Amino acid sequence: MVGFEKHGLMPLFRVFSENALDAIHSASLEVLEKTGIRIHHGESILKMLKENGCIVDFGKGVVKFPSYIVEEAVKKTAKTFIMYGRNLKYDFKLDGRHVYFTTDTETTSTVDLSTGEWRPSTLDDLEKLTRVTDALESYAAGGHLTTALDKPNNVRCLYDYAAALNNTEKPCGWSVYPPELAIQLTDYQLEIATAAVGSEKKLKERPIIGGVFCTESPLQLDGRFVETSLKLAKLGFGCDVESMPLAGATAL
């Protein structure tokens, strides 16, 4: 089956059988081809997809992906990926055969250890929690466990990322918001990462930074975050697209 690398050594714990994986893959292709995905705030992305063979409704912002395009993209996608930390001893490879634990990201509330109060998280909380996860051997990565709600919203992600890098040597996640400033803030975060490792050359050799953005329910993407990820990919940095909708919580 296209898109799933076969290994000689299979994981000890498997959730899905090969038939189940085939069924999920086929159903995903069908949804992408027949229903499509809405991409808002992304006129340039829509044009790019149209030029590369996708069926685009510019009025609705809906893109339908012929299955052969998806299959070809899956073939070209790297089957392994290295997560880099500031300290190389914390590097690890994502290869489908190993499981690693990391913290969640951007939680907005914290239980105050002094008072027991449930309150909005702060930069101080983020720094302290990052140091805890840095010390715990059970976590392979972390650093963006909560967010600095005591900082201005338009630059909060910069405080978050700088705090993460200053308090862990492990791989750490990052994100950009608000979306209308995504490209500009990404440039600033690249500067922060460059300062952390010493030079642009070192950052490209060991990219401790990468794009992370989430899908929206139902079947939507914010084009501004897609543009950000494309920018990072062209620079040689990996990108992580997460399926954020949760049944019963965010799914409409």
Language model: regions and residue ranges:
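Acidic/polar, glycine-rich intrinsically disordered N-terminal extensions of enzymes
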Residues: 1-124
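Helix-rich catalytic cores of soluble enzyme domains
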Residues: 120-252
